[in-house]
Amino acid sequence: MPGEQKKVCIDVPYIDQSKLYPTGCESVSTVMLLRFLGIDITVDEFIEKYLEKKSFEERDGQVYGPDPHRYFCGSPYDDESFGCYAPVIREALEKIIGAEYTVTDETGMTTDELVEKYIDQGMPVIYWACINMRDPILYR
């Protein structure tokens, strides 16, 4: 029927991050995607072997963190960590899959565009969002 929306359900293996990886949503989502592609890897293996991580530093009573575009800030095992952005995960994925697949950073693409280009075609995506899909807080 015209105007009817189709539903696409992609059978991606679920991994619960809540107990072991409180700030590891990027890592857990990446491993879920890799398992969907048939690559047998654990979340711990991904974090320890492939994820670029850097700790926070304290200087003169101030805490400084690394660039989240280059590193996971802190540790996915620590509930006080910050996380990372798409370039860090893209680089980790490229180390694992090599030339077998193409990894594309689609930062800035709308949800509808991601659905049409990937999910409707049966390909899962790794999606960055704020808790409860609220708008991000931007600092200048």
Language-model-detected regions and their locations in the chain:
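Short helix-loop-beta junction
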Residues: 92-99
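Active-site-adjacent substructure of cysteine-protease-like catalytic cores
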Residues: 107-140
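Active-site-adjacent structural segments surrounding the nucleophilic cysteine of cysteine proteases
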Residues: 1-86, 131, 138-139
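Short, well-structured beta-strand/strand-turn elements
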Residues: 99-109
